[in-house]
Amino acid sequence: RINGFWYHFIDPDSGKRGWKDSHNIELSNASAGTMLLGALAAAEYFGGEIEKLTYELYETMNWKWFTDPVTKHPYLACYPEDLPKSVPYGINEAGMFGGWSAYSEHIFLYILAAGAPREEFSTGADSYYAMKTYKGSYKGETFIFCGTGAAFTYQWTHAFIDFRNLRD
């Protein structure tokens, strides 16, 4: 793990970065965040040692490090140790590339980053409000939508976070 995040694929035997070609496996905030969402759900249900371990993991995740300081958007992924032979996006000097910028399935990243237990690792609300949103309306009600319109985009974060009675 680096700055609290782990790689997109982990070798089940060694617990290290790996899959078919470990050189091209990126550090992934989406994979780490997805695992954390599941752990938080388990922690809420079971409590005790699971809750303690979950928050120990969450406290190590430096969301500011994984966020572009200019755009305030989370980077897409990172190659902190060695750069791959080819990546479809530009990579900065820290190995970061791409970005999550508009409303999509990754909205949970903004929420986890804003609510990080350690203030020095939290992005606060600035990152969330920097997210690009596209608005539409239906029968006079305004709503935010994603460019692809895929159901997964709307359902993923909502499977873990109850947005009822919340308005932004």
Predicted regions and their residues:
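Extended ligand-binding clefts on enzyme/binding-domain cores
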Residues: N3-T34, L40-A41, Y45-D168
